[in-house]
Amino acid sequence: MAKTLSKPASGALAPWLGISLIVILFDQLSKIAILKTFAYGAQHALTSFFSLVLVYNRGAAFGFLSTASGWQRWAFTALGIGATLVICFLLRRHGQQRLFSLSLALILGGALGNVIDRLVYGHVIDFLDFHVGGWHFPAFNLADSAITVGAVLLVYDELRRVRGSR
């Protein structure tokens, strides 16, 4: 009996893209809610260390390059689109590696959430604001959180893989 060629299971993109889509959906819905509810810069304390505040980030993480002349909008958009292509390629090749793929799906969803902001608004909408005493962490959003969790899981997965190969 002749064997038929079939695509390897590693090519299953749909579940991982579904996770990315969920991240994008929650990120964009939260930003729309903040835009409709808050005035720019108004701070609403929820606890002694956490507030909601509407701020615009024209730069990258922690406001990096936010005061540049405007070129950064397109540079970070291109970077996000490039990351999307690389991540989709990696998901297609390594879709069977669950933790690795989950981390990439979270990073992808977060990156695209911020790319959407840059294309639609010209900046990223941030609103989660942590502060303790005189220390203040830069405001961020759900997309940034997904990117961070994805990056931590990616490092954890790699450390686990390296330890397992010893």
Curated annotation (Swiss-Prot):
One of its GO terms (molecular function) is aspartic-type endopeptidase activity. It is found in: Cell inner membrane. Keywords: Aspartyl protease, Cell inner membrane, Cell membrane, Hydrolase, Membrane, Protease, Transmembrane, Transmembrane helix. The active site is at D126, D144. Its main location: membrane. Its EC number is 3.4.23.36. PROSITE patterns: SPASE_II. It comes from the Bacteria. GO terms for cellular component: plasma membrane. The keyword Hydrolase applies. It is a multi-pass membrane protein. It catalyses: Release of signal peptides from bacterial membrane prolipoproteins. Hydrolyzes -Xaa-Yaa-Zaa-|-(S,diacylglyceryl)Cys-, in which Xaa is hydrophobic (preferably Leu), and Yaa (Ala or Ser) and Zaa (Gly or Ala) have small, neutral side chains. The keyword Transmembrane applies. This protein specifically catalyzes the removal of signal peptides from prolipoproteins. This is Lipoprotein signal peptidase. It comes from Burkholderia ambifaria (strain MC40-6). The gene is lspA.
